[in-house]
Amino acid sequence: MWTLSTENAVEHLHFAGYWPPHVPAQARMLTGGVSNMVIRVEPIEPSSQQPSMILKQSSELLRTKAEWRSRLDRIWIETETMKFLGDVLPPQTVPVILFEEQENYLFGMTDLGQTCDVWKLLLLEGRVEPGLARSAGLILGTIHESGLRHNESLQNGRLADWTVFDELRIDPYYRTIAKVHPIIAEPIQQLIHQMEHLPQKTLVHADFSPKNMLIDSENHLGLVDFETAHWGDPAFDLGFFLSHLVLKTFRAMRLGLPTREEFLDMISVFWEKYQDTFCSVENARALEYRAVQHLAACMLARVDGKSPVDYLAEADQDSVRVLTIEAMKNQTSRLEAFILTLKDRFHQETD
């Protein structure tokens, strides 16, 4: 397998015919993820009409402190998911695939983000955008609803294989925190069992996170990174996404930003739009229960799993442990109840 780098990317594109030979270009590595080599190739001359391009190559060894590996062919799960979602989501929401090189586990795609902001960075600055939360609810609801409507074409083949989801989520997140905190080993095993045996599965993104959401000048939300997609439980997406909003609420409080309540209000905005969009779910109350449990598990995993967040103070990490372990032990079933408990904890810490 040929290995992509900033030093050879432009030459490779010229040689393969993916970039015009008369257009000088430069390559720049994009940071933020841990699992792939991602490079932006763009014209050197700003006046050039040639659009920039994103190259992505799968890496077996992830860039984390703890050793973490995943199979190379997960990149074809990503391209398959992108092709499907490109047809069901609004234009410019998902990049368009330009070429694929099977032997190099590499593909090229259109660039959504050259002039975009990453929503994660806006949240870390304390910026509250209810409109983006609503857009996220619409997009995730559409993914889950469209998955159900196309279940015959999606539930077989690559998306039915959970190997990558296990390597990148179940093991480094759930099994890891169960070992660190044996008191929640049984609830965690129950979550895994529910995901595996859920009667009504759908397309699950499994990396639906503000770090993978690009915001343009008109507040349009673009979505990237689909390698963990699979045919599974939509509640995982809900818990995974909401965990990011809640964890950033801890940060906002610690920094003294006047946005704590507004951060939590974004959760309600997201949840309402999601429920309006994913209307084919068989048991909405059961989905909410599983979503709250995944929310607690994902929050704890970002403190004590293999890929912890780097923006929480030690005291906040302890608060996350107490809150989430309690929610899993008590089997908290309503999102509103979880948020009320969170608000009470915030008030206790500020009194």
What are these regions (language model features)?
Residues L30, I39-N151:
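ATP-binding pocket architecture of kinase catalytic cores
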Residues E80, A235-C279, L295-E314:
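Active-site activation/catalytic loop segments of kinase-like enzymes and analogous catalytic loops
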Residues M1-E11, T110, S146-R149, S153-M195, ...:
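Active-site catalytic-loop/activation-segment of kinase and kinase-like phosphoryl-transfer enzymes
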Residues R28-L55, L191-F236:
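Active-site acidic catalytic loop and adjacent metal/ATP-binding pocket
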Residues M1-A27:
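Juxta-kinase regulatory segment immediately upstream of eukaryotic protein kinase catalytic domains
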